[in-house]
Structures are given as C-alpha cells and as structure tokens.
Amino acid sequence: MPKNLQFSIALLLTFLIVHALHAAPLKTLSLDFKRELTENDKTERTAGTLHYDAEAARVIVEVTEPLKQIMIVKGKVVEIYYPVENQAFRFTFEGRIPLPFVESILQSTQAEYGLTTIGYSLDRYEIADDVLYTYWTPPEKAKDKLGTVILGSRDGRLISAEVKTSDGQLTAKSLYRNHTKLGNSHIPMEVTSSLYRRKSEVLEYERVIYSNPQLNAQPPNSILQFEIPKSVTIKEVKW
C-alpha cells in the first residue's frame, strides 16, 4: 500500500468522534474530512468523505485527494481499493482497528465508548476543572499491548483521550474541539492526535477537520453498498 495513502497506524489512538451518538436515532452518518499527517518533518494531506452505516456496522471512506481510494471497514477487517490502479488489499487486525477517525465512528454507537466490548473495565474517575476523567484498564492478557485509557469529558462532550503504558508513559493523545449539535449529540469537528516516543517526543501528529455532517441522509451514489469488484484480486495482509 503506498505510503502517501496510508492512514496513521496507531493502536488505541482515539476512541470517539461523537459522545453517546447512540442517543440519536442514528441510521447513517456522513462527514467530509480533510486530514494532515506530519511525521519526520513531512506532511501528507488527504481529503474525502466518510460514511457510516449503523445497521451494518460498516464504514466506507471515499478518498478523493491525493489519489482516489475506497476503504471498507467492518469488524476487524479493512479493505482498501484503488480504482485507477485496479488494486485491492485486505488487512485483518488482531485487536482494535488502528485507524483513528474510522475507529472513532465505529465505537460511537456503543456504550462505554466501546471499551467494555474489548475487555476494558472502568477503574476510577475524578473531576478537575469541570472535566470528568475516567480511567479504563485493559484486560490482563493484553496489558502489554493496549495500555490504560483516560477519557476526559465536559458537559457531556468528549474533549480528550489518552493512552498510557503500565508504567505511566504517555503513548498517544487526542483532543476534540469545535463541537456541533447533530441530533441529540455534539460532534467535534476538529480532532488532533499525537503519537509519542519515550521522553514525550512526538513521533506522529495528525489533524482532521470535519465538515458537512449529514445524519440519516442516503448518499446519492449508493456508496454504502459498495463492494470491491469480483474481477479484482485482493492481496491478504495480516496485521
């Protein structure tokens, strides 16, 4: 898969774009996005539209820039199709899908931010400066891989997510800003995420700007039903 078309690969980088979106009668959700990924002093820019089908628990990402690409996300499988090159890849992940803003949509319709479904448990909570912080511990068998998750929310809106190792080292952090009302929920229209090396050195920085949110609006081109053409050979990749 071309490097300039990869979405950031980062375990547990972020969990939600919508706080308790399941409170609204969600059937479909579409968002335009512009994404910047900075790594090693180089910035890649990607733009397109993300579609979520709640009933099918399926995400379709249409990338329009820099090159055309269609990504299909369902369960622990991600399929990527390049229509111009007529190539396709299928990635199967053991744990969470390491695609920050795609994963956040998938988890948005689940209680407890989807953490309990993969074995996380609420350890404790605290309130500081009107922000509610909840601390989530991973299942024992996955502590070395997943790390502790700390979520911050204010007025029912998710504003931050952090991942720390068992010894307290910060490995990832996401901030949610510019919330807008959609149905019964507030959607952050800007999400920034950082991956860290040891000593808090930033390894990778990602900024995503969302626009034109559409709730329960059927996309005109039936993209939600898209399947990779049967004539295309799909290369299998285990992650």
What role is predicted for each listed range?
Residues 52-106:
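An acidic-aromatic
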Residues 49-51, 69-70, 148-150, 178:
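Short, surface-exposed charged micro-motifs
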Residues 1-9:
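Bacterial N-terminal signal peptides that target proteins for export
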Residues 34-38, 64-66, 81, 85, ...:
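Hydrophobic lipid-interacting interfaces of membrane-associated proteins
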Residues 42-49, 71-73, 168-173:
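Amphipathic hydrophobic-ligand
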Residues 15, 19-57, 217-219, 224-239:
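N-terminal leader/targeting segments and the immediate start of mature chains
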Residues 24-35, 82-149, 224, 228, ...:
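Flexible, processing/modification-adjacent segments and terminal tails
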Residues 126-225:
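Gly/Pro-enriched, hydrophobic low-complexity segments
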